[in-house]
Design a protein with these regions (language model features):
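Aromatic-rich peripheral "rim/lid" segments of glycoside hydrolase catalytic domains that contact
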Residues: 4-7, 16, 20-65, 78, ...
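Glycan-recognition surfaces
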Residues: 123, 129, 223-226
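Distinct, well-ordered alpha-helical segments
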Residues: 26-30, 75, 99-116, 146
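Histidine- and/or cysteine-centered catalytic micro-motif in compact active-site loops
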Residues: 94-95, 128-132, 172-175
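Glycine-rich anion/phosphate-binding loops
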Residues: 1
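Loop/turn elements at helix/coil->beta-strand transitions in domains of secreted/extracellular proteins
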Residues: 7-14, 83-89, 118-124, 161-168, ...
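Aromatic-lined carbohydrate-recognition surfaces of secreted/lumenal glycan-active proteins
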Residues: 12-19, 62-103, 168-172, 221-227
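Active-site glycine- and acidic-residue-rich loops that bind
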Residues: 67-70, 97-108, 131-153
Length: 291
């Protein structure tokens, strides 16, 4: 990959060296280390004279950790060796805003990688932030959803900022859904105006929290995961959902304005316009300006 980038004359800003290495169960341990063998469907590798080595791991899981127990530091050392000096090296994971124990485990592993290297080699930590909410048509209930989520998001960003590392939101989206008795996701496929408003408020809150709790020098940026609500973009991820800033027709949603307000630090109000935006919300009998 480094050779390919060099051939194209590309110097990437950042590189995700290790992705999703911390388990959700097993006490939030590092996959491939201390007998934590991958994820669901994986079992301990076996070896015998007749069959040789059988990893017993599903494709794409952390089989290489079986061979190299200190793969964390080696991965970063190789990335630092072959990538441009300007490229920032990141580690990335999910559910960090909802699981303080997983966040703590990731940070401890980052510390151990830096220590094993003899100096800081991890430049930044990425938090995916695939947020799921179940908004209603009740404004008070939706306000509580945003408020409760804000406490978790604030705490996450404060904890990440305390590491002194760069902090990046890597895969932000806000899914409107509920979960049935079997724990299966059910998308809110036709959200009401109030539900769209709640989604916008969550987007706004995330941007505001990031700017408030992460010092500017540590702000690496926020990446939105996918662009529109077009079903073609959600064939596999958040199927039937409406998680993005633009609708299926590429028109701006309230979520777009929520993100813009969060970036601007103010309600842009009528300064934010465009006939496509207004027409979309007039069809829903919703004011184009969030009151």
């Amino acid at each position: 990959m480094a050779e390919h980038l060099a051939e194209k004359g590309v110097t990437p800003y950042g590189y995700d060296v290790i992705n999703e290495a911390i388990t959700d169960g097993n006490g939030n341990k590092v996959r491939g280390v201390d007998n934590v063998f991958g994820m669901s469907g994986d079992t301990e590798p076996t070896e015998n004279e007749a069959d040789g080595l059988e990893l017993n791991w599903e494709s794409g899981h952390f089989y290489w950790g079986y061979y190299v127990k200190d793969y964390g530091v080696k991965a970063f050392q190789l990335a630092r060796k072959y990538l441009p000096a300007e490229t920032k090296l990141f580690i990335n994971d999910y559910n960090l805003e909802t699981s303080p124990s997983k966040l703590a485990a990731l940070i401890e592993w980052v510390k151990s990688i830096d220590a094993a290297n003899g100096s800081a080699i991890v430049d930044g930590i990425g938090t995916q932030m695939h947020i799921a909410i179940n908004p209603t048509d009740d404004a008070t209930s939706n306000t509580s959803i945003v408020s409760n989520l804000k406490e978790k998001v604030d705490a996450q960003f404060k904890t990440l900022a305390a590491t002194g590392k760069l902090v990046r939101v890597t895969e932000l989206d806000v899914d409107m859904c509920k979960y049935n008795a079997n724990g299966e996701r059910e998308a809110i496929s036709s959200p009401s105006a109030a539900q769209y408003k709640c989604q916008a408020d969550v987007y706004k809150m995330v941007f505001e929290s990031y700017k408030t709790n992460v010092p500017e020098a540590q702000q690496s940026g926020i990446t939105i995961w996918s662009l529109t609500d077009n079903p073609d973009e959600h064939e596999y991820w958040l199927k039937d959902g409406k998680p993005n800033l633009f609708d299926a027709d590429n028109l701006r949603k309230w979520a777009y304005k929520g993100a813009c307000d969060g970036i601007a630090g103010e309600d842009l109000g009528l300064k934010f316009g465009g006939e496509d935006y207004k027409a979309y919300y007039e069809r829903q009998n919703v004011s184009p300006t969030v009151q």
